[in-house]
Regions:
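A generic structural signal for short beta-strands and their flanking turns/coil linkers
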Residues: 13, 33-35, 45-47, 57-59, ...
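Active-site/ligand-binding-proximal alpha/beta "capping" segment
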Residues: 162-208, 216-220
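Structured adenosyl-cofactor binding patch, chiefly the S-adenosyl-L-methionine
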Residues: 205-247
Length: 247
């Protein structure tokens, strides 16, 4: 199977790969003239590309006409995740990309145990993890990780951009299947779904009320208690299954 790389430098039947990926292809993989790879432009379009030349830190290609990526789901999913301790957020990002998430937005809430520290530096690492996961699993877009929102109020103020907001709460709520069936996307657009899950301490009752007032639909996650790094992935898996994106 051809190796996959992301580049935005694709036009008029040619393409250029630069930086670390160019080094990987030319020095690590020992690519040769005439070898074929798959290039992705980050907007769900892929190209079959043939190596035509090497520069100091570049690889040049001729490319065939682009075609839609088969790996992209029919829904646009954003994970809003209560900021967890240690490397749990890295796990959520890595596996969330594999499952089809497009956006990740960490946030701090009342019962978060983790405290803000070196967030810009961490954000660079998180986006790199998303980038590598997207390459590994064959995604046609580059999922992004935002800087964390400072409190749950900021989360609620950001929710009007979505067609469906799922607030995951231990007190339960409406069936997920029903909520997905009732949600309607804008004409010609993917259904935009936001999934909100808590950190280790869960949510305060006031935060659940804030989410409901902001239009979020409360959903339960079954009779078992899920860890904060398990819950978001469980919901994403359920959403992808119910929308036909894991078939």
């Amino acid at each position: 199977m051809p190796h996959r790389y992301f580049t935005t430098e694709i036009s008029d039947g040619t393409a250029v790969l630069r930086g670390a990926d160019a080094h990987h292809l030319s020095r690590v993989m020992r690519g040769k003239l005439g070898d074929t790879v798959i290039l992705c432009d980050g907007s769900a379009v892929e190209y079959t590309a043939t190596i035509t030349g090497f520069g100091d830190e570049t690889v040049e290609f001729s490319v065939e006409p682009g075609y839609p990526s088969a790996a992209e789901p029919t829904v646009d999913v954003t994970l809003l995740v209560g900021y967890p301790k240690q490397d749990k957020l890295e796990q959520v990002i890595r596996h969330g990309v594999e499952l089809g998430c497009d956006h990740f937005i960490p946030f701090f809430s009342r019962y978060c145990v983790a405290a803000p520290k070196k967030e810009e530096q961490k954000n660079e690492r998180y986006n790199r993890i998303a980038f590598e996961a997207a390459k590994q699993c064959g995604r046609g877009v580059l999922p992004d990780v935002a800087l964390p929102l400072p409190n749950f109020g900021a989360v609620c103020r950001s929710l009007d951009r979505y067609d469906l907001v799922l607030f995951c709460y231990e007190c339960g709520g409406a069936p997920l299947r029903q909520l997905l069936a009732e949600a309607k996307p804008a004409d010609g657009e993917k259904l935009k779904i936001a999934i909100i899950t808590g950190a280790e301490g869960g949510f305060a009752a006031e935060e659940a009320e804030m989410a409901a007032k902001a239009g979020a639909k409360t959903v339960g996650l079954g009779p078992r208690i899920l860890r904060c790094e398990t819950a978001p992935l469980a919901v994403v898996s359920a959403v992808m299954t119910l929308t036909g994106n894991l078939e």
